[in-house]
Amino acid sequence: MQIVAQNWLVLSLTDSAFFLGLDAFLQQLPIMLFTLIGGVLADRYDRRRTLLASQYVQMATSATLAVLMYFHAVQIWHILVLSFVTGLAQAFGGPAYQSLVPSLVAKKDLPNAVALNSIQFNVARVIDPTLFGATLVVFRANGYDEPQAMNAAFALNAMSFLVVIYTLMALRVKHL
């Protein structure tokens, strides 16, 4: 939901394909530059804690955008900085997440777990834009303007991280 809402916001603020591309680039750049370092850290430190930190940062970036939208203070540079920070969090959280999966299942179940993980990732790529569209439609139908509806999408996305964070905090895995 975040990516579609953020793309929409960038276009609403700038009406510029350049800034839309720059936003995507700045989110992907840290992933390209720091994922290998994130992998080393995931191998050396507690993966669950690394992943928790990543989720907290991503929740904070989404919540920051929601607050900026609420106060009508959001500017393009805010979005670009938050995109870079989100990319950094993903660069360190992604390897921790991927390396956590083998710790959660028996070795014989690992191929199925990897397949389910892949399915989950791709289903989320389809559902997220749909959720954003539904959020926009519901809020617009109830009298909210477009910025308020987009603000709701960012706030809902930030709150969705609470489920992941709670689950990770409850997770007790040996050999991390």
Roles of regions detected by a PLM:
Residues D15, G38-G39, M69-A73, Q90, ...:
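Short helix-capping/hinge motifs at transmembrane helix termini and TM-loop junctions
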Residues D15-Q28, Q148, A152:
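Loop-to-transmembrane helix entry
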Residues N7-L13, A66-F71, I127-L156:
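Transmembrane alpha-helix termini and helix-breaking/packing motifs in multi-pass membrane transporters
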Residues Y56-A73:
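C-terminal ends and interior cores of transmembrane alpha-helices
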Residues D15-S16, D46-R47, A106, R140, ...:
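A helix-boundary/kink motif common to multi-pass secondary transporters
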Residues A17, A73-L80:
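Primarily residues marking transmembrane-helix entry/exit sites
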Residues H72, S99, S103, Q148-M150, ...:
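Helix-loop junctions on the cytosolic side of multi-pass membrane transporters
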Residues M1-Q6, L22-A42, D46-T61, H78-V137, ...:
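Substrate-agnostic recognition of the 12-TM MFS/MFS-like secondary transporter fold
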